[in-house]
UniProtKB/Swiss-Prot annotation:
Its main location: secreted. It comes from Plectreurys tristis. This is Omega-plectoxin-Pt1a. Toxin that inhibits presynaptic voltage-gated calcium channel (Cav) in Drosophila nerve terminals, most likely through specific block of the Cav2 channel (known as Dmca1A). Keywords: Amidation, Calcium channel impairing toxin, Disulfide bond, Ion channel impairing toxin, Knottin, Lipoprotein, Neurotoxin, Palmitate, Presynaptic neurotoxin, Secreted, Toxin, Voltage-gated calcium channel impairing toxin. The presence of a 'disulfide through disulfide knot' structurally defines this protein as a knottin.
Length: 44
C-alpha cells in the first residue's frame, strides 16, 4: 500500500506507519499515531 501523506492519521486501514515509517504509540495501529516525515509522533 502507498504511504499516506505527512500528517495523515494512521489507523487499521492505513499501513503507512508500519510500511514506511516506524509507528509505535501503544499498539501497531495506534489510534493516536500520525505519520510524520520519516518518523512518527504521538498525539496525546
Amino acid at each position: 500500500a502507498d504511504c499516506s501523506a505527512t500528517g495523515d492519521t494512521c489507523d487499521h486501514t492505513k499501513k503507512c506507519c508500519d510500511d514506511c515509517y516506524t509507528c509505535r504509540c501503544g499498539t501497531p495501529w495506534g489510534a493516536n499515531c500520525r505519520c510524520d516525515y520519516y518518523k512518527a509522533r504521538c498525539d496525546t
